[in-house]
Regions:
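Feature captures hydrophobic
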Residues: 2-175
Length: 175
């Protein structure tokens, strides 16, 4: 019928806007604020853990960090990031379209976009910290929270055993 609204995304009383009109930074911030998996992953992070974030479709610097076990994502440059991410819009959409996923599924999606060949889907990683600092900041706890799903995915990519993390880190440092 004319004037009748049939979807929640067009309903003016709906609390959510359609994701196709939101910028990557807003989508990612909302994801971290509402996703149980994002909160669970951030709970492993320690004081000082930080990620510098840039988007290929949004200008400016952003930072991700945890405070009191809760994820925070805001505009500004990370002071001493453990690593920096440059995230394409396709990767943002893939991650944020799964708010109900668990930490394992979220981790696999993240890693799939690190190895993606398509620039519109890619997450580029520039690692600044070594294994000791990453461990002290809780990043291995985040990996462990992904459990068998992430470990299985890594094994399929040839990263097996205790040296898998060190091998993956060395690949990221080389770029």
């Amino acid at each position: 019928m004319p004037g009748e609204q049939t979807s929640a995304s067009t309903d003016p009383s709906s609390p959510r806007e359609p994701s196709d009109i939101l910028t990557s930074d807003v989508l990612l911030r909302r994801f971290f604020e509402t996703s149980a998996a994002g909160r669970r992953a951030a709970a492993s992070l320690k004081r000082g853990a930080a990620v510098g974030v840039r988007f290929t479709d949004v200008p400016g610097d952003f930072r991700f960090y945890a405070q009191d076990g809760r994820p925070h994502f805001d505009m500004g440059k990370a002071g001493d990031p453990d690593f920096e991410l440059t995230i394409a819009p396709g990767a943002v959409r893939a991650i944020t379209s799964k708010p109900e996923s668990d930490v394992g599924d979220l981790g696999i999606t993240f890693f799939q976009h690190i190895v993606a060949k398509d620039p519109s889907e890619k997450i580029q990683v520039k690692l600044h910290a070594g294994l000791l600092k990453l461990t002290m900041h809780g990043w291995l706890g985040v990996l462990a929270a992904g459990g068998p799903k992430v470990i299985g995915w890594m094994a399929q990519k040839g990263l097996k055993g205790p040296s898998a993390v060190a091998s993956a880190l060395s690949r990221l440092k080389k770029g």
